[in-house]
């Protein structure tokens, strides 16, 4: 089993690339954003964790994500401590996900994790793929999500530069031109990896 990690700036198209690995290479994808969403929605321990740090963000046992975002945007020591605990939970889920797939006939696992390198999630990867888009396209994608300028700037500050990401990655995929172009890059990377490890799809 080969573990691929995706790194890239916010709005670079990591989830799109992950979906293409799933669709065209039959890779299984660990979507950290989706995992965190489910934890906020359904995990009583995480809901209590949120409440212990940010009481106003939990109402009648439900996490108010808009209120919680307010604390994220402050990004103070309290948030950093909370985030560290949450990351530990996500790390364990990711570890279990990888272990579970290692027991099946799974060839590729793709980790779609924000701050993959910054939070050291890349340490369990066999290869890291840098996903890159031009800055104008990134901003357009984020505006469609309704992201504020302040949120964009904060997240950008937390992330490595494109140069650092590229330096720490094995491959680069450029998004934003066409679906076929992205798919061809995905398939080319798989071909290169298979050549390195001496196996065939």
Swiss-Prot record:
Molecular-function GO terms, alphabetical: ATP binding; dephospho-CoA kinase activity
Record localization: Cytoplasm
Alphabetical UniProt keywords: ATP-binding, Coenzyme A biosynthesis, Cytoplasm, Kinase, Nucleotide-binding, Transferase
A Pfam family that the UniProt record links to this protein: CoaE
Pathway: Cofactor biosynthesis; coenzyme A biosynthesis; CoA from (R)-pantothenate: step 5/5
Reaction(s) catalysed (UniProt annotation): 3'-dephospho-CoA + ATP = ADP + CoA + H(+)
Listed SUPFAM superfamilies: P-loop containing nucleoside triphosphate hydrolases (SSF52540)
The EC number(s) this enzyme carries: 2.7.1.24
UniProt keyword Nucleotide-binding present: yes
List of residues binding ATP: 11-16
Source organism superkingdom: Bacteria
Span of domain DPCK: 3-201
GO cellular component terms, A-Z: cytoplasm
GO biological process, one term: coenzyme A biosynthetic process
Family statement drawn from the similarity comment of this UniProt entry: Belongs to the CoaE family.
Chain's role: Catalyzes the phosphorylation of the 3'-hydroxyl group of dephosphocoenzyme A to form coenzyme A.
Annotated protein name in UniProt: Dephospho-CoA kinase
């Amino acid at each position: 089993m080969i573990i691929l990690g995706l790194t890239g700036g916010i709005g670079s198209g990591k989830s799109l690339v992950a979906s293409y690995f799933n669709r065209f290479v039959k890779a299984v994808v660990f979507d950290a954003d989706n995992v965190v969403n489910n934890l906020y929605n359904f995990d009583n321990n995480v809901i209590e964790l949120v409440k212990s740090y940010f009481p106003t963000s939990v109402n009648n046992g439900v996490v108010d994500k808009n209120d919680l975002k307010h604390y994220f945007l402050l990004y103070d020591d309290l948030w950093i401590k909370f985030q560290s605990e949450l990351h530990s939970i996500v790390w364990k889920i990711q570890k279990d996900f990888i272990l579970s797939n290692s027991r099946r006939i799974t060839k590729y696992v793709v980790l779609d994790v924000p701050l993959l390198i910054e939070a050291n999630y890349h340490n369990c990867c066999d290869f890291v793929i840098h996903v890159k888009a031009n800055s104008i396209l990134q901003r357009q994608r984020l505006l469609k999500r309704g992201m504020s300028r302040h949120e964009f700037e904060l997240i950008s500050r937390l992330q490595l530069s494109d140069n650092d990401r590229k330096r720490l990655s094995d491959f680069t995929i450029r998004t934003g031109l066409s679906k076929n172009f992205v798919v061809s890059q995905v398939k080319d990377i798989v071909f290169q990896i298979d050549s390195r490890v001496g196996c065939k799809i």
